[in-house]
Amino acid sequence: MHWLADYWWVVLIILVGMILNGIKELRRLDHKKFLSNKPEIPPHRDNNAQWDDDDDWPDKDKKK
C-alpha cells in the first residue's frame, strides 16, 4: 500500500478520466429517439401465482 501513498494522484486522474468519459457517452445518448422506438415490454409473469390461491391463514368465520 506504500505505492498508493506515492501515486495517489495517478489513481485520481484515472477516476476523473472515467467519469468524464461516462459523461461524454451520456451526452451522446439520444433519449428521444429511444423513447419513440421503445420496444413493448412483455407482461410480468407472476412466479408465485400457484401459491396465491393457497390460504395459509385460518378462516375467522369458520366454526370448529
Swiss-Prot record:
Q: Which UniProt keywords apply?
A: Cell membrane, Membrane, Transmembrane, Transmembrane helix
Q: Which InterPro entries match?
A: UPF0370
Subcellular localization(s) per the UniProt record: Cell membrane
- Its transmembrane ranges are 3-23
Q: What is its main location?
A: membrane
> How does the entry describe its membrane topology?
Single-pass membrane protein
What is one term from the GO cellular component aspect held by the record? plasma membrane
Q: Which family does it belong to?
A: Belongs to the UPF0370 family.
Descriptive protein name: UPF0370 protein YE1145
Q: List the disulfide bonds.
A: none
The record's section on Pfam families has: UPF0370
What residue spans carry the region label Disordered?
A: 36-64
